[in-house]
């Protein structure tokens, strides 16, 4: 957006997930500014120095490679610390894969649950998969292409093969696609294929009537 371009031109510093990717955008729009790498591998070390710059009255833009900073991307800890110190935070809305996948799925969107990437620890992973199987709201997940088949098989085990699902790939990019119907059919579609790109998954709510708890 024109607002985002103006921000990138005028801030003191741009903290970006990958300087090479951000430079492509800057070159396209004729933006010249200072860049530093700020990603999951170095954000813990770099946050204190960025906070110092902010406390000196300087402005910093945080840019991720894809999607929205802080949503399974660097930025959350920096924003939290900056806000606690009274620094003004402005979010420039941009592409958000979770919302795009939810809207394009046609599943109920007035209430939904965002889980991001499931944990690798099996006990935690199984607990969340069980929660997803019983959710009465649409669930949105992120997954890497290398682990998509594993996750689809787990969802089939916990939710059943007939549960409605949509796998969205490369949202907003050239090869964007949305594959959906039920878990069985989506799993069959992807098995045996080379899967590339950013993956976002929408899982429909359970159609079972769950027992309710009354509080007196």
Where do the PLM segments sit?
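Glycine-rich, flexible N-terminal cofactor/catalytic loop recognition
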Residues: 1-40
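Short active-site oxyanion
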Residues: 8-14, 87-89, 137-139
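General beta-strand structural signal in soluble alpha/beta enzymes
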Residues: 16, 91-94, 141, 167
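A contiguous loop/helix-start segment that scaffolds small-molecule binding in enzyme catalytic cores
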Residues: 58, 138, 142-208
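A short, charged helix-loop
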Residues: 115-134
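Single conserved hydrophobic/aromatic residue that forms the stacking wall/gate
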Residues: 207-216
């Amino acid at each position: 957006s024109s607002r985002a371009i103006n921000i990138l031109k005028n801030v003191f510093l741009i903290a970006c997930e990958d300087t090479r990717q951000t430079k492509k955008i800057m070159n396209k729009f004729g933006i010249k500014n200072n860049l530093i790498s700020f990603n999951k591998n170095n954000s813990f070390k770099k946050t204190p120095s960025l906070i110092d710059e902010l406390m000196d009255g300087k402005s910093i833009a945080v840019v991720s490679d894809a999607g929205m900073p802080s949503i399974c991307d660097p930025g959350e800890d920096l924003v939290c610390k900056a806000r606690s110190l009274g620094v003004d935070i402005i979010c420039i809305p941009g592409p958000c894969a979770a919302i795009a996948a939810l809207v394009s799925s046609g599943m109920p969107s007035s209430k939904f649950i965002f889980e991001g990437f499931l944990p690798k620890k099996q006990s935690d992973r199984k607990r969340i998969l069980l929660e997803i199987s019983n959710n009465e709201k649409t669930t949105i997940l992120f997954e890497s292409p290398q682990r998509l088949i594993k996750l689809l098989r787990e969802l089939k085990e916990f939710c059943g093969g007939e549960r409605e699902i949509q796998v969205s790939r490369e949202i907003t990019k050239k090869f964007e696609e949305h594959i959906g119907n039920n878990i069985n059919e989506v799993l069959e579609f992807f098995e045996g294929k080379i899967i590339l790109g950013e993956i976002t998954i929408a899982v429909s709510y359970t159609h079972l009537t769950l027992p309710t708890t009354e509080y007196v």
